[in-house]
Amino acid sequence: MAKANTASRVRKKVRKTVSEGIVHVHASFNNTIITITDRQGNALSWATSGGAGFKGSRKSTPFAAQVAAEAAGKVAQEYGVKNLEVRIKGPGPGRESSVRALNALGFKITSITDVTPLPHNGCRPPKKRRI
């Protein structure tokens, strides 16, 4: 018969503790993606408006971004993150509400930076929508 050696081989995964993190908020017109990383850029947690249960046009609401930020923030709290630096990219409606949600969770926000890429007259933009 096979022996059950599971007790000696199984090791509990040790979570690293990180005191400072960087929040990358990518707010597009259709969705909001929130990623919390450590200082080196290794992802600790992430959440999206679509992953939070919102589909279609409800993904592009400030409330959906708030729910996604709360979900990512709760996982980051398990890593021991206390201070956050926020980097916001994109013109979407979830820019401000995601920062407010992280602030309400008890994180100390050290800085808020807008890192939206702006072309110096690079590629031609898409044609205007005619509705």
From Swiss-Prot:
| GO CC terms in record | ribonucleoprotein complex; ribosome
Q: Which PROSITE patterns match?
A: RIBOSOMAL_S11
GO biological process annotation, one example:
translation
Keyword Repeat attributed: no
Keyword Cytoplasm attributed = no
Q: Where is the signal peptide?
A: none
**Molecular-function annotations in GO:** rRNA binding; structural constituent of ribosome
Question: Which keywords belong to this entry?
Answer: Ribonucleoprotein, Ribosomal protein, RNA-binding, rRNA-binding
Domain of life of the organism encoding this protein: Bacteria
| One Pfam family of this chain | Ribosomal_S11
Family statement drawn from the similarity comment of this UniProt entry: Belongs to the universal ribosomal protein uS11 family.
Protein role:
Located on the platform of the 30S subunit, it bridges several disparate RNA helices of the 16S rRNA. Forms part of the Shine-Dalgarno cleft in the 70S ribosome.
- Tell me the subunit arrangement: Part of the 30S ribosomal subunit. Interacts with proteins S7 and S18. Binds to IF-3.
- Recorded protein name is Small ribosomal subunit protein uS11
